[in-house]
Amino acid sequence: MEEKQILCVGLVVLDVISLVDKYPKEDSEIRCLSQRWQRGGNASNSCTVLSLLGAPCAFMGSMAPGHVADFLVADFRRRGVDVSQVAWQSKGDTPSSCCIINNSNGNRTIVLHDTSLPDVSATDFEKVDLTQFKWIHIEGRNASEQVKMLQRIDAHNTRQPPEQKIRVSVEVEKPREELFQLFGYGDVVFVSKDVAKHLGFQSAEEALRGLYGRVRKGAVLVCAWAEEGADALGPDGKLLHSDAFPPPRVVDTLGAGDTFNASVIFSLSQGRSVQEALRFGCQVAGKKCGLQGFDGIV
C-alpha cells in the first residue's frame, strides 16, 4: 500500500533573495554578491524539507495563474511535492517578497508583498480527500476558517480506527490575537519566540509553562528559541530540551524555523519520541543555517 502523505496548508511566496556583504544603509546603493529566485512561505518551505527528508508530501495554499505561479509550481514538482490540492484563485496576485541576507552573519530581512490573494478557505478544504493523509500541518493565517478545517479533521478522526487517524500540527508564528484560538487544536502546536515574547514570556520554558493550558488534552507544545535550542512540553508535565546545533558559520537563516517544524513533524511521523524529534529538528535547522537555501540539509 502506498504510504500516506503529509499535507502542509499555508503560504507559498516567491522570494527574490539578494546576498550582501553587509546590510545596506538607507538611501544607499550597493552591489549584491548573488541573487536568486526561491520558493518560500512557511508551509511551502516545510514541504521542501519534508521531501528532502524522504516523506511523501503535498502542499495546499492559494496561487493565481501567471509567471510567478508557473515558477513556484515547477519548483514544487522539481522537489517531488504534490500540488494537486492548490486552491487556484481567479482574483489577486501570487505573493512575492524581497529578502536581503547578510553574508557576514546570516541574518535575513524580509519585505513581503502579501497581496490581495484570498487564503485557502474551509470550503476549499471540504474538497480534500482526507484519507490520503497521515499528518496535516496548518500554518496559522486565516484562523476563523482554519478552525473549521481543523474541526473537519477532528470529525473525520472520530470515525477512524486509531491507526487511521490523522495527526495534526498547528503553527502559531505571528503575534496576532486571531491566531491564538488555534492553540486549542492539534496534537502538536508550534509557538514562535515572537509570539512568546509578545505575550510577555522571556524564555521557551516560561512560554511553555504559561501557554500549556491553552492546548488540547494530550497535546505537545513546542517552542524554538533560536540559538538557545528548543523546548517541548507534553501531557506528562515533563519539560524537554534540545540544545541548538549551530553550523561552523551561519550563512542563511531564511526558512530555519520552517526547517525545524518540518523535521520535528517528520521525526514524530516516523514514530520517534518527542525528545528525539526535538533534537532532530534542531540538528537539521542548524545544518540549514550553514547553507544557502535547502540543498544539502540531508
UniProtKB/Swiss-Prot annotation:
GO molecular function ontology, one term from the record: protein homodimerization activity
E.C. number: 2.7.1.3
Residues given in the record as ATP binding sites: 108, 226-229, 255-258
Keyword Transmembrane helix attributed: no
Regulation of activity: Requires potassium. Inhibition by ADP.
Biological process (GO), any one: response to sucrose
Assembly and interaction partners: Homodimer.
Name the UniProt record assigns to this protein: Ketohexokinase
Organism whose genome encodes this protein: Homo sapiens
Gene that specifies this protein: KHK
